[in-house]
A protein has these predicted regions:
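Acidic/His- and Gly-rich active-site-bordering loop/insert found
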Residues: 1-9
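Short, glycine/serine-rich, charged loops/turns that create anion-binding
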Residues: 2, 57-59, 213
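Short, flexible helix-adjacent loops and helix caps
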Residues: 7, 39-42, 254
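Mixed-charge, polar/low-complexity N-terminal
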Residues: 10, 80-81, 86-87, 179-187
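Short glycine/proline-rich turn/loop motifs
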Residues: 10-13, 222-223
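Acidic/histidine-rich catalytic neighborhood of metal-dependent amide-processing enzymes
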Residues: 14-138
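Active-site-adjacent substrate-binding region
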Residues: 105-255
Length: 255
């Protein structure tokens, strides 16, 4: 991840930043999802394939390079995957039922707490994807009530930020969240500012998972994007909801 000059009078030099939230948080979610989905696939519990895709070049000047390349491959029927063993898998006949984009999911807004956005693109299929995310959020929130009654969590408080990744965080209560479904035409949706817009423009049903985004906060596109601004209880909750959403989408009948 990179941030630009640290003040408005700078020369615009690109400075290396840790990118703890943007976008290691979502990358961590993909890695957590992989063994769960692989096990379900081996057991024959998935009705459709799930691709875990790490998209490169979202920021300017690349301008969603990875998302554009993927969409081009899908539209032109040239989708092929190159394996580590040199084998090529032809996926040109695949039809994508939907895409979930995760971008910045681990910073709990200090002014509007415990909210994340479920931002669908255009079309009824995208709204169905958002409905699955809404149901997954309700399932998670119901689970937190039960999990927090256990002796190991009963007397604990909210999670607290840690200054860096070298510290083991304290165990905290599971955090219930409010997932706001924000249509692409609404002012609260930030789909337009992500890879999700590329998929929507190409006619692919898409939903963005993102924190309650604040463009003016410290730690966004600057060198302060470190563990010091990460809320692990919040990020873990959004990640769990996202994984549950994908599982639901891969197992429920399509509309």
């Amino acid at each position: 991840q990179y941030g630009y000059g640290t003040n408005k009078d700078g020369d615009g030099a690109r400075l290396a930043a840790a990118g703890a939230d943007d976008n290691h948080s979502a990358t961590s979610c993909l890695m957590l999802a992989a063994p769960i989905l692989m096990q379900m696939s081996r057991e024959g519990r998935l009705q459709r394939d799930v691709w875990l895709v790490h998209l490169t070049g979202e920021e300017f000047p690349a301008d969603c390079l990875g998302a554009r390349h993927l969409c081009q491959s899908l539209v032109e029927g040239g989708m092929r995957v190159h394996g580590e063993d040199g084998r090529i898998t032809d996926l040109s006949g695949a039809r994508v039922c939907g895409v979930y984009v995760l971008d910045m999911i681990a910073h709990n807004n200090d002014r509007s707490r415990d909210i994340f956005q479920i931002a669908p693109g255009s079309g009824p299929e995208a709204m169905w994807l958002a409905w699955q995310a809404h149901l997954a959020t309700a399932i998670w929130n119901a689970g937190t009530v039960l999990w927090n009654r256990r002796p190991s969590r009963r007397d604990l408080g909210r999670g607290r930020r840690i200054p860096h990744g070298g510290i083991v965080p304290e165990v905290a209560r599971h955090l219930a969240l409010h997932g706001e479904v924000r249509p692409h035409y609404g002012p609260g949706s930030t789909l337009f500012n992500t890879d999700g817009q590329i998929f929507s423009d190409a006619g692919v049903p898409v939903v963005l998972f993102m924190e309650n985004y604040d463009i003016n906060r410290k730690g966004y596109h600057d060198t302060h994007d470190t563990m010091a601004n990460i809320d692990l209880d919040y990020g873990a909750a959004v990640a769990a909801i996202a994984i549950e959403t994908v599982v639901r989408t891969a197992t429920e009948p399509l509309p």
